[in-house]
């Protein structure tokens, strides 16, 4: 039933709470798990009189560094869960998290997305939005949300 499960991660402990249920489901159904880390590029400033934007080479170097850190993070998780008896794949992309999650889910024929909520509310939710909510609206497939412990 669920043979390809996508687990989006942001590097936080709450996000990693989705790993165990995803791996258990994949093992039960004989499936695989795709670990996804989306690196959010910093906005590039346009030069205005009296202001100097960061040079593009600095921007590119920072993005490369963030991608390398994300790859190392996912490699560590794959190593940690190596003995779970499930095929684990890792993917690092750059972009808007919700859009990239939906794109990967569609492009890789994912059967289920398992992700954690961060429990943001009020001003934090207004400022940062809800990736989980955007994925719910954009992905047309089953999604298992793991709530943040209260």
Question: Which stretches of residues belong to each language-model region?
Answer:
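Small/aliphatic-rich secondary-structure junction motif
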Residues: 3-56, 84-89
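Short, structured coil segments at secondary-structure junctions
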Residues: 131, 139-141
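Short, structured motif recognition centered on aromatic/hydrophobic residues
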Residues: 6-7, 33-35, 73, 112-116, ...
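A short acidic, glycine-rich active-site loop
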Residues: 55-72
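Short, hinge-like loop/turn segments at secondary-structure boundaries
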Residues: 50-54, 107-108, 131-132
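Glycine-rich, Arg-bearing micro-motifs that act as flexible, cationic patches
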Residues: 112-134
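Structural beta-alpha unit
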Residues: 1, 14, 28, 76-113, ...
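Short, conserved catalytic or interaction motifs in soluble domains
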Residues: 11, 125, 148
């Amino acid at each position: 039933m669920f043979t390809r499960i996508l687990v989006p991660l942001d590097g936080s402990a709450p996000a990693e709470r989705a790993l165990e249920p995803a791996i258990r489901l994949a093992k039960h159904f004989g499936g695989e798990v795709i670990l996804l880390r989306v690196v959010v590029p910093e906005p590039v400033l346009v030069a205005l009189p009296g202001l100097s934007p960061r040079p593009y080479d600095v921007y590119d170097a920072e993005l490369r560094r963030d991608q390398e850190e994300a790859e190392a993070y996912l490699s560590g998780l794959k190593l940690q869960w190596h003995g779970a008896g499930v095929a684990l794949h890792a993917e690092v992309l750059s972009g808007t998290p919700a859009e990239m999650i939906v794109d990967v889910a569609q492009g890789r024929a994912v059967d289920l997305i398992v992700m954690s909520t961060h429990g943001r509310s009020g001003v934090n939710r207004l400022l940062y939005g809800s990736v989980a909510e955007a994925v719910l609206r954009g992905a047309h497939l089953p999604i298992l949300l793991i709530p943040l412990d209260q």
